[in-house]
Amino acid sequence: MNARGKDLETADLLKNFVFSKSKDVDDTQKKWNSIVDNLDKIDTTNYIRHYWNSSHKFIRKNDLYREIVKFIKTPADVSAFLDSLENCSQFYHDIAFPEENVDFTDDKLISCLKNLKILKAKTFYPILLAMKQAKESYSEKDLLTVAETIEVYVFRNFTICGKVANTGERFFSEIALRIYGDLNSVTAICKEIR
């Protein structure tokens, strides 16, 4: 609980945890501040959850803290975790707020991300985060191809068919995890989404 008696958010618990495991508190503070600054108005817990679900087995918000602390054992683990979170944080902001994007130059990609935002789609974020982190180097054109496939999927399943949007959460997370393995091309990723 915080000073006002409210339960701490998962992001606050994780922040406390990584600081307790860190050997270099100043560096940890610098990285954490950079993550929060990059995210701007985005909820840090939601970002961390999408980030986690992009490279690990699907986890719900209530179990996120318990799951992450299983993986962070040493100061080196803390540093690697924060480096990766920091590396993806601006990218995440740009997919969530394409109209404020910093890094994307492809107008079609920006437009597609805006369309997904209009559709209130967020459950696909782990797929694009996985593409950012994968050993394959995906271009903006690759991201566009996948984002367009996601846009069709979201429109068809959630807008036309009326499925509940969060039903896609596990589906997209499972695809994201496979991007590090057998789904190692844009064609394979799009085929799986279709």
Regions found by a protein language model. Give the residues of each.
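A cross-family structural signal marking well-folded subdomains
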Residues: 11-194
